Curated annotation (Swiss-Prot):
Located on the platform of the 30S subunit, it bridges several disparate RNA helices of the 16S rRNA. Forms part of the Shine-Dalgarno cleft in the 70S ribosome. Part of the 30S ribosomal subunit. Interacts with proteins S7 and S18. Binds to IF-3. Belongs to the universal ribosomal protein uS11 family. It comes from the Bacteria. HAMAP family: Ribosomal_uS11. This is Small ribosomal subunit protein uS11. GO terms for biological process: translation. Keywords: Ribonucleoprotein, Ribosomal protein, RNA-binding, rRNA-binding. The lineage of its organism: Bacteria, Pseudomonadati, Chlamydiota, Chlamydiia, Chlamydiales. One of its GO terms (molecular function) is rRNA binding. Pfam families: Ribosomal_S11. Disulfide bonds: none annotated. Signal peptide: none annotated.
């Protein structure tokens, strides 16, 4: 009896693309900070979050965790040839400004900083106020 020979799927190595400019999307929530770096078309080059970098619980919402996440995302994006970025901020978390500072200090040239925080035109009812 002859067994069907199946080929093992080989893991494809990501090719290093030379992308000179891109967009950095920083989503800073009260619980976490997510940094995504894309090319101008919107294809993701690299991403990092405070949780991916190794922080958990309340430490994820700190400004330092956002700094480390932004440095991690910038390092992997710069290895694919990224030099100049536009920064798009979303949210009101603690890691907004510190993430932008980390991107500048890691060697990326920031051309534009945009604030795209979604503001409702009196849409859904907000959750109940927290009483401490």
């Amino acid at each position: 009896m002859v067994k069907n020979q199946t080929q093992k799927k080989g893991v494809k190595r990501k090719q290093v693309k030379n992308i000179p400019s891109g967009v950095v999307h920083v989503k800073a929530t009260f619980n976490n900070t997510i940094v995504t770096i894309t090319d101008p078309a919107g294809n993701v080059i690299s991403w990092a979050s405070a949780g991916k970098v190794g922080y958990s619980g309340s430490r994820k919402s700190s400004a330092f965790a956002a700094t480390v996440a932004a440095q991690d995302a910038a390092k992997t994006a710069m290895s694919s040839g990224l030099k100049e970025v536009e920064v798009s901020l979303k949210g009101t978390g603690a890691g907004r400004e510190s993430a932008v500072r980390a991107l500048i200090s890691s060697g990326l040239i920031v051309s534009v900083i945009r604030d795209e925080t979604p503001v409702p035109h009196n849409g859904c009812r907000p959750r109940k106020r927290r009483r401490v």
